[in-house]
Curated annotation (Swiss-Prot):
The keyword Transmembrane helix is annotated on this UniProt entry: yes
Keywords, alphabetical: Cell inner membrane, Cell membrane, Membrane, Transmembrane, Transmembrane helix
Protein's membrane topology: Multi-pass membrane protein
Keyword Transmembrane helix among UniProt keywords: yes
Organism for this UniProt entry: Photobacterium profundum (strain SS9)
UniProt-annotated location(s): Cell inner membrane
Family membership: Belongs to the YciB family.
This protein's name: Inner membrane-spanning protein YciB
One GO CC term on file: plasma membrane
Name of the gene: yciB
């Protein structure tokens, strides 16, 4: 249910962009993201930091997009969010407390070297997504960017998550039969 909530604002943005324009879609994205945060709080009594960062960025950059009637701000939002995630993961690694381990370490037991590799892989992934978004957003037509934002980045994230899951599975301690 929680993962479904994460996709609702994106779906609303896409549908309203295709049926209206970037400004209607952006306004709806701001509202849908606010509702998403409220519903998450209501259902789980907790909102993840990443979700709050995303909400803040959607509100600020979406608001600038609407107020200045300039689609470039909503395009920058994607890059800035990915950059924040990348920098956050890198800083957590430098401080010796990989954020990925903090998020998943209670459920999954892995050696610290594996957590470090996963944390650095996601650091790189988010950095690459930030750079690719800049390229697509500012060199290709708006329609291409919207499709890339909704489907391309989602597909890349899903694939990278599956690859990470396979890597984690490969490095999980194997249960031994003690009979």
């Amino acid at each position: 249910m929680k993962q479904l909530l994460d996709f609702i604002p994106l779906i609303i943005f896409f549908v309203l962009y295709k049926t209206n324009d970037i400004f209607v879609a952006t306004g709806a994205l701001i509202i849908a993201t606010a509702v998403q945060v409220a519903v998450t709080w209501f259902l789980y009594k907790k909102v993840e930091k990443m979700q709050l960062v995303t909400f803040a960025m959607v509100t600020v950059f979406g608001g600038l997009t609407l107020f200045l009637h300039d689609e470039n701000f909503i395009k920058w939002k994607v890059t800035i969010i990915y950059a924040i995630f990348s920098i956050g993961l890198a800083v957590s690694q430098i401080m010796g407390k990989p954020l990925i381990k903090s998020m998943l370490g209670k459920e999954i037991t892995l050696p610290d070297t594996v957590w470090t590799r996963i944390n650095m892989a996601w650091t790189g992934f988010f950095a690459v997504c930030a750079v690719v978004n800049i390229y697509v957003a500012f060199t290709l037509p708006l329609d291409v960017w919207v499709n890339f934002k909704v489907f391309g980045l989602l597909a890349l994230t899903l694939i990278f998550t599956l690859v990470t899951g396979g890597y984690i599975y490969h490095h999980m301690p194997k249960e031994t039969d003690s009979e």
